[in-house]
A protein has these predicted regions:
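Conserved pre-ATP/AMP-binding loop-to-beta segment of ANL
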Residues: 31, 158-161, 167-188, 195, ...
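Gly/Ser/Thr-rich phosphate-binding loop
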Residues: 263, 268-276, 285-343, 354-355, ...
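A short helix-loop-beta submotif of the ANL/AMP-binding
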Residues: 68, 74-94, 98-102, 107-116, ...
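Structural core segment of the AMP-binding/adenylate-forming
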Residues: 38, 56, 60-61, 84, ...
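Conserved AMP-binding/adenylate-forming core of the ANL superfamily
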Residues: 10-15, 31-76, 80-84, 101-106, ...
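AMP-binding/adenylate-forming catalytic domain of the ANL superfamily
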Residues: 143, 493-514, 533-541
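AMP-binding/adenylate-forming catalytic core of the ANL superfamily
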Residues: 100, 106, 117-119, 356, ...
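Conserved AMP-binding/adenylation subdomain of ANL enzymes
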Residues: 207-224, 232-272, 281-283, 287
């Protein structure tokens, strides 16, 4: 059983809300830096004052308790202040993926029911393109370096408002005092397996996500936490900004993830801990080795999921590593600690807070060693999603048989370690065998000429599916399909060796580095796809 850290239990019961955390920090650490940027430092008090000014401006704009407000902003201090301002009002934050456009963007805007969006000026053209499709939006607040719009101008049926008009001079605001069951946000999932869904997030849900990361990284008040993730994503907002506030630590706010700049930024700010998605850790690991790789300030890194070379990663960069498994809907029910049992685990269940079962298609529990869908139940109220926004039918389907169905295939071993196998939609059924796309990807990525790869199912001629891999070579490399198959023949069972290969310069991804496999599945086989069977290249049986 995983034991949670008592130090992170400061905000118990009804105090597990953003409002209580900020109020506490203003008393005990008001002048301490909460956020560091390339241009300055911002204390807890600085951001609270800015949040008060913005809360007064939003109230004047007509925003009230329970209203949804869209934030489509790049990483900036104003994003954090607006998040706090909306919480002060009791309004509901709806972060927008900054890469959304077209119908995907208009769907999210309309589905949220928001009347107000605050958007960076660089996204104004995208909003303009779909403005005629907006059903409820009445106000667009434009923020950024571009010339601000004339107040009262129109975007479709919505009025344009300069950011300066909501930035009042009054820093004082009588904040709403929420409870853990009050709604804080609607977080739209990143859409790696289909259209985005709005997850209803309570204060308790967001708090527990952030508090859990404190345990996973052993975050202390003295820590400087650097994780180059976008604030519109839960990992950027809760696992970093919110976690350091609960711990009383300091966070570094980056713009975007850059493998080339990562270590220099860590050294610049003396960062001691970080959170890396597996794709980010993989790119860091695949950078050319340098003599000073271990000469950095990082001590602890949370990598989700682990890279197969995690032990080499730890030694090369001189860090401890832990991992977890989770998602927007179900939070993070597992912890590994820094003593990793192996390079494939995603931790053990935190039995104080969650129940997790591995089940078959009829929700019957499966024994250790057998992969199935992971289903979750909380032991404490309000720490997983309250449902899907405006889609009760999706909520009922997700919570069938009184368990939250995650859509993730996991497997448990006899010692209670859990292993991520695949997304249920990414699992491939070929000739009676279930194939993990992630396992095939790991072997392809081990080829010295490969930077990264995505493996997807495509329809077979008769029944079931075939394996297709989209491969991104390393710069300057041009691996032959036949050579890659020969490499995989020695590393994979015959039925897992891809039939189809396609080489690409890049893979479609979310801003947090997750490969958007649904886009690859929809595209499927193309004119550029190489067919192993047509080329008469055999596999070893």
């Amino acid at each position: 059983m995983i034991q949670t850290a008592p130090a992170s239990r400061l905000f118990n019961g009804e105090a597990a809300t953003l409002a209580h955390v900020l109020a506490h920090r203003l008393v005990d650490a008001g002048e301490k830096p909460w956020i560091l940027t390339a241009t300055g430092r911002f204390t807890y008090r600085d951001i609270d004052r800015l949040a008060g000014r913005l809360a007064n401006g939003l109230i004047r704009l007509g925003v009230g308790r329970g209203d949804t407000v869209l934030l489509m902003l790049n990483n900036c201090i104003e994003f954090i202040a607006l998040w706090c301002a909306l919480a002060k009002i009791g309004a509901i934050e709806v972060p927008v993926n900054c890469h959304y456009k077209g119908r995907l963007l208009s769907h999210l805007v309309n589905d949220s029911g928001a009347r107000v969006i605050i958007a960076d000026s660089e996204f104004f053209p995208r909003l303009s393109e779909v403005s005629n499709a907006f059903s409820a939006l009445s106000t667009v607040v434009i923020y950024g370096a571009a010339p601000e719009p004339r107040s009262g101008a129109l975007l479709g049926a919505a009025h344009l408002v300069p950011y300066a008009e909501i930035l009042t001079d009054n820093e004082q605001f009588a904040a709403f005092s929420p409870a853990p069951w009050d709604q804080l946000a609607v977080m739209y999932t990143s859409g790696t397996t289909g259209p985005s869904k709005g997850v209803i997030v309570t204060h308790g849900h967001a708090f527990e996500y952030a508090r859990g990361v404190i345990d996973m990284l052993d975050i202390r008040p003295s820590d400087v936490y650097y994780a180059p993730l976008p604030l519109f994503h839960i990992a950027g907002q809760w696992a970093v900004v919110y976690a350091v506030a609960i711990a009383g630590a300091t966070a570094v706010l980056p713009d975007t993830f850059s493998p080339a700049r990562f270590w220099s930024t860590c050294r610049q700010h003396k960062a001691t801990c970080s959170f890396l998605l597996g794709a980010m850790a993989n790119l860091l690991y695949r950078q050319p080795p340098a003599s000073d790789d271990a000469d950095n300030t990082l001590e602890r890194v949370l990598i989700v999921p682990l890279v197969p070379e995690v032990e080499d990663f730890k030694q090369r960069f001189g860090v401890l590593v832990s991992t977890t498994w989770g998602g927007t809907e179900m939070n993070c029910p597992t912890r590994s600690g820094f003593e990793l049992p192996n390079a494939r685990t995603c931790g053990r269940v935190d039995n104080d807070l969650y129940e997790v079962r591995i089940v078959d298609e009829n929700d019957n529990e499966l024994p250790p060693g057998v992969a199935g869908e992971a289903v979750v139940r909380p032991r404490k109220p309000w720490i997983v999603m309250a449902g899907y926004w405006r889609h009760p039918e999706w909520t009922v389907q997700a919570w069938r048989n009184l368990w939250l169905h995650t859509g993730d295939m996991l497997m448990a071993d006899a010692e209670g370690n859990l292993y991520f196998v695949d997304r249920t939609k990414d699992a491939i059924r070929r000739r009676g065998e279930n194939i993990s796309s992630m396992e095939v990807e790991q072997e392809i990525n081990a080829h010295p000429d490969v930077l990264e790869a995505a493996v997807i199912p495509v329809a077979a001629e008769v029944t079931e599916q075939e394996v297709m891999a989209i491969v991104v070579p390393k710069p300057g490399c041009n691996p032959a399909p036949e050579a890659l198959i020969a490499f995989l023949n020695d590393r994979l069972p015959y039925f897992m060796v891809p039939r189809y290969l396609e080489f690409a310069s890049e893979l479609p991804k979310t801003p947090t580095g997750k490969i958007q496999k649904y886009a690859l599945r929809e595209r499927g086989i193309t004119a550029k796809t190489w067919d192993r069977i047509q080329a008469a290249v055999p596999v070893k049986k």
